[in-house]
Curated annotation (Swiss-Prot):
Its EC number is 1.4.3.16. Keywords: Chloroplast, FAD, Flavoprotein, Nucleotide-binding, Oxidoreductase, Plastid, Pyridine nucleotide biosynthesis, Transit peptide. Catalyzes the oxidation of L-aspartate to iminoaspartate. It holds the Pfam family FAD_binding_2. The active site is at 368 (proton donor/acceptor). Pathway: Cofactor biosynthesis; NAD(+) biosynthesis; iminoaspartate from L-aspartate (oxidase route): step 1/1. This is L-aspartate oxidase, chloroplastic. It comes from Oryza sativa subsp. japonica. One of its GO terms (biological process) is NAD biosynthetic process. Belongs to the FAD-dependent oxidoreductase 2 family. NadB subfamily. Binds 1 FAD per subunit. GO terms for cellular component: chloroplast. It comes from the Eukaryota.
Length: 645
């Protein structure tokens, strides 16, 4: 159950997080514990997003130099199933890599990623990085665009920090070898996208994320103090309690290649694991985006915020409208970047009637939430499956130069974008909510920092402005460095810590036939969950549909859980497919609970029962962990917490 509360809890939420003293947990590491925890939902009663102390740019500079440490004493004490590092980074997108490259100057670093290192949301980002780099532009203008797009729910201090520090972070990327497009005058070519009042998007054709990922991975590869662990699935954070505070000391993981459980003990953990796109059937996110970081953090007693604000990108490629259909169903939808509309692309229905001018004065350059709802309305009214995005009126050379990846993908399926409109449809794209973070990426769990899509910093408010995601990741990855170093210096991690948490049990002990049945059942449950989310928790919502989704998700999860038990699944077992399913259930429930708590329509959350924006409700949604309640195992820890010794 979730209760709607009044009042505000600080970032530390000492009075709101209830943990049984005298215990330590691998926070929810395995599934079916006798202990249940649930979320308490409240709409924060003060407009400022984070109850954390502001830190100026000058304060952010290194207050003391620890010195270059090739490997700490603890990091040398490795064995086959336990590894010790000063810093553990979960995720290999722009946020995780950029952070790792900074903290590696002060200690040993492990980067854990669940697939190949390049397989992140960053790698699929087409548009670019927004930054004020033109004399005619200003930080104030970028701030205003961000706040308007965010439906005035953005935290103004966070917005100012990001818009002010962004240009320097972009320059650092260039210095590290990232190559961006330049104009004929030799200066950076700055594109314009929906919601922006100026040209301020730094880009590398329509493959910006890929170029940034390439440059950062190359730098990581050249850094001897960073160890990268691919195909390591993060299971749960290792946490304990001391003096009313919760501390994080690393993470348990599953090496998918060796099928061994690997424990990473660390002084500092940065969570940069990306979003939750795969709670929906169609998403631009890669298959790794299953909400692992948010779900782990929720089980670890971290505060979660603004989960109702799921951004649907207005223009994903519609395979239904292609002349040559793909041979197999895509794992993730192919994104048609915002920059196509920014470059003059026009949206039509299938009767070639331009429709955006009927919905918003900004037409195709309106923010994403407006465009996605407009397309959704057209599709429902006309009974069609896609609309058309036309850029063919622009010079062929310009189109091919700016959008080579899109042009090539469409041509593979028989469509020439220089002559024909592109069939597009909205798809789940970005989670504006996540783990609640302060101005330095800090969470209410000591030693746990967050950056990138997994975090909710207050920048995006109720809707993210185009190309602000990579920007936010860069800024907060850098801002988390100094407090991480300070915590690392002060932290006392005894090697014996590794023995304090129970180890997960691998599912390989089950017979192959049983495992096959479980994996097949899990695939079915995943598809059913995605269908429920799209039908009842999509672009347009209602209270009845949200409540319907709530009980359908609960029933589906219980049915799946019971099937696993009948087939011999044990309470402490882990497997990649089942852990992902667990996290998907958890995140889906958080989205629904948050959506039910917001009794207005704002930004990405539009509900027919409360169709108007209300000033009195201009507050973030905050989910606090609270007393034991009756929930399924998505929120259950394996064991009670131990007192930190």
């Amino acid at each position: 159950m979730a209760a709607l509360m009044n009042g505000f809890g600080s970032l530390q939420c000492k009075a709101t997080v209830h943990v049984e003293k005298g215990h330590m947990q691998a926070s929810g590491m395995a599934f079916f514990s006798p202990v249940n925890r649930c979320a308490q939902v409240h709409i924060s009663s003060i407009p400022h997003f984070i109850g954390a102390k502001s830190v100026s740019a000058s304060q952010l500079r290194m207050r003391h130099k620890v010195g270059s440490i090739r490997a700490s004493a603890a990091s040398c004490l490795q064995d086959e199933t336990t590894k010790y590092f000063d810093f553990v980074v979960i995720g290999s997108g722009v946020a995780g890599l950029r952070y790792a490259l900074e903290v590696s100057k002060y200690g040993s670093v492990a980067i854990i990623t669940k697939a190949e290192p390049h397989e992140s949301n960053t790698n699929y980002a087409q548009g670019g990085v927004s930054a004020v780099l033109c004399p005619s532009d200003s930080v104030e203008s970028h701030m205003q665009d961000t706040i308007v797009a965010g439906a005035y729910l953005c935290d103004e201090e966070t917005v100012r920090v990001v818009c002010t520090e962004g240009p320097e972070r972009v320059k650092e990327l260039i210095a590290m070898g990232a190559s961006f497009d330049h104009g004929e005058d030799g200066r950076l070519h700055l594109a314009r996208e929906g919601g922006h009042s100026h040209n301020r998007i730094v880009h590398s054709a329509d493959m910006t994320g890929r170029e940034i990922e390439r440059a950062l991975l190359q730098a990581v590869d050249n850094d001897d103090n960073i160890s990268l662990f691919g195909h390591h699935f993060a299971i749960d954070l290792l946490t304990c309690q001391s003096n009313g505070e919760i501390y994080c000391y690393g993470v348990d993981s599953l090496d998918a290649e060796t099928q061994k459980a690997i424990r990473f003990i660390s002084k500092v953990t940065l969570l940069a694991s990306g979003g939750v796109g795969h709670i929906y059937p169609s998403t631009t996110n890669p298959p790794v985006a299953t909400g692992d970081g948010i779900a782990m953090s929720h089980r670890a007693q971290a505060v979660i915020s603004n989960m109702e604000f799921v951004q649907f990108h207005p223009t994903a490629l519609s395979d239904e409208g292609l002349p040559i259909k793909p041979a197999t169903r895509r794992e993730n939808a192919f994104l048609i970047t915002e920059a196509v509309r920014g470059d003059g692309g026009i949206l039509y229905n299938q009767s070639m009637e331009r429709f955006m001018t009927s919905y918003d004065d900004r037409a195709e350059l309106a923010p994403r939430d407006v465009v996605a709802r407009s397309i959704d309305d057209q599709l429902k009214k006309r009974g069609e499956k896609y609309v058309l995005l036309d850029i063919s009126h622009k010079p062929r050379e310009k189109v091919l130069a700016h959008f080579p990846n899109i042009a090539a993908e469409c041509l593979r399926h028989g469509l020439d974008i220089t002559q024909q409109p592109i069939p597009v449809v909205p798809a789940a794209h970005y989670m504006c909510g996540g783990v609640r973070a302060g101005l330095q990426g800090e969470t209410n769990v000591k030693g746990l920092y967050v950056a990138g899509e997994v975090a909710c910093t207050g920048l995006h408010g109720a809707n993210r402005l185009a190309s602000n995601s990579l920007l936010e990741a860069l800024v907060f990855a850098r801002r988390a460095v100094q407090p991480s170093i300070d915590h690392m210096v002060d932290a006392d991690v005894d090697p014996s810590f590794a023995k304090k948490w129970a180890r997960p049990v691998l599912s390989v002990s089950l017979r192959d036939s049983i495992l096959s049945d479980i994996i097949e059942k899990t695939k079915q449950a995943r598809m059913e969950l995605q269908s429920i989310m799209w039908e009842y928790v999509g672009i347009v919502r209602s209270t009845n549909r949200l409540k319907h989704a709530e009980w359908k998700i609960s029933d589906l999860e219980s049915e799946w859980e019971e099937f696993l038990f009948r087939r011999g699944w044990k309470p402490t077992m882990v497997g990649v497919e089942t852990c992902e399913m667990r996290n998907l259930f958890c995140c889906a429930k958080l989205v629904v609970k948050s959506a039910l708590a917001r009794h207005e329509s704002r930004g990405l959350h539009f509900t027919e029962d409360f169709p108007y924006l209300e000033e009195s409700k201009r507050k973030p949604t905050v989910i606090f962990p609270t007393h034991i309640q009756e929930l399924t195992w998505s929120s259950k820890p394996l064991q009670k917490q131990l007192q930190c010794k």
